[in-house]
Regions:
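Phosphate-binding beta-loop-alpha motif at adenosine-nucleotide cofactor sites
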Residues: 143-147, 167, 218-247, 291-295
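Short beta-strand segments
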Residues: 15-17, 40, 146-148, 171, ...
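PAPS-dependent sulfation machinery
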Residues: 42-146, 285
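Conserved phosphate-donor/acceptor-positioning beta-strand/loop module used by diverse small-molecule
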Residues: 148-151, 159-184
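A glycine- and Lys/Arg-enriched "phosphate-lid" helix/loop adjacent to the NTP-binding pocket
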Residues: 170-171, 179-207
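Conserved, well-structured beta-alpha core segment at the onset of a catalytic domain
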Residues: 1-55, 208, 212-213
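PAPS-dependent sulfotransferases, especially Golgi type II membrane carbohydrate sulfotransferases
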Residues: 1-14, 19, 84, 106-116, ...
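PAPS/PAP-binding and catalytic site of the sulfotransferase fold
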Residues: 22-36, 159-164, 227-252, 268-271, ...
Length: 321
């Protein structure tokens, strides 16, 4: 469980969770601790290339970034020839289909629905080879603990298959009613357009993601897993950061906090993620957004509450508000 970290054993923290659950701010604050590096949502480095290289947290395009440039640049082609050769050819720049195949295959295997068009082993070997290269090249940059906030439990499952990686899974949860309001506000400009259908679909997606995250934690080979509530992190960031550092086995030294709830974010090289957070540096106040308690439409609130009640209770959230 707590094997010593040898020279070839890299540590990666993977943050799982539903959208609008706070994974980006948690990874940003963690990445501001000495010895930790926030990579952002690593899976999107490749998937976004068809629409042009995304902008790194340092404000340069990923392919021009001094951190990412030689990780995802042309030299990757030779390294990935063996693992990507076959049906998809040997073009490592078009890996979105591979990534999608892996996610769909893993979900089907866990939910026991649908038929498999390609073997799980074939898909896993190809995707794992790609991510192994990315993680190990990133670790070679500075040897620190890497943080991947890609959210989807399927990517966490792939991480668990990479040799030479000491992986840690963190399941980040947030009150689904708060997450739903964040989604409504973002999508509809705060108009309150949270119809019954939208609330029902949201609740179903929230339940599925968190159910799969729990499965990923149970299947994780090392048992190095924990759950963090967004609200607890906002209320006591120091306690959460220390707990995570203890799990990883790293002395964090001085925490990037000023006072109880102000984080001091340092410039980062996040490849993807919430732009409102990852492009920030300097002091950022950490506070839980309770606007949903006043603004969320009662119908949407009731639907989300009823449908997510089992996990609301499991995660310690009140049913009645």
């Amino acid at each position: 469980m707590n094997e010593p970290r040898g020279p070839d054993l890299s540590s990666v923290i993977f943050l799982m969770g539903f959208r609008q659950s706070g994974t980006t701010i948690l990874s940003s604050v963690l990445g501001s601790i000495d010895g930790f590096t926030d990579l952002g949502e690593v899976h999107n480095v490749w998937g976004q290339r068809g629409r042009g290289w995304p902008k790194c947290g340092c404000q340069l395009r990923v392919n021009d970034c001094p951190f990412w440039g030689d990780i995802v640049g042309d030299p990757v082609t030779e390294d990935l020839q063996p693992s990507l050769a076959g049906q998809r050819g040997a073009d490592p720049h078009d890996v979105e289909r591979l990534r999608t195949d892996w996610v769909q295959q893993w979900r089907r295997s866990r939910l026991a629905v649908g038929s498999r068009t390609r073997s799980e082993k074939e898909i896993a070997d190809r995707y794992v080879s790609l991510m192994e290269l990315v993680y190990k090249r990133a670790a070679a940059k500075n040897g620190s603990v890497l943080i991947d906030s890609s959210k989807d439990p399927a990517y966490a499952a792939a991480l668990d298959r990479i040799p030479g990686i000491r992986s840690h899974l963190i399941h980040v949860v947030r009150d689904p009613r708060a997450a739903f309001w964040s989604r409504v506000r973002k999508s509809h400009g705060g108009s309150g357009d949270d119809s019954a259908l939208l609330a029902t679909r949201f609740a179903g997606s929230w339940l599925r993601t968190n159910f799969l995250a729990e499965l990923a934690m149970r299947k994780h080979q090392s048992g190095r897993t924990t759950r963090v509530r967004y609200e607890d992190f906002m209320a006591n960031p120091a306690g959460v950061l220390l707990d995570i550092s203890t799990m990883v086995g790293v002395d964090p030294g001085p925490l990037p906090l000023k006072g109880d709830t102000t984080a001091i974010l340092r410039p980062n090289h996040t490849a993807s993620g919430n732009a409102r957070v990852r492009f920030k540096s300097g002091p950022v106040e950490l506070k839980s957004d309770d606007e949903w308690r006043r603004e969320l439409d009662p119908t949407g609130r009731r639907i989300v509450t009823v449908l997510t009640a089992p996990l609301l209770i499991r995660y310690g959230y009140p049913i009645a508000i």
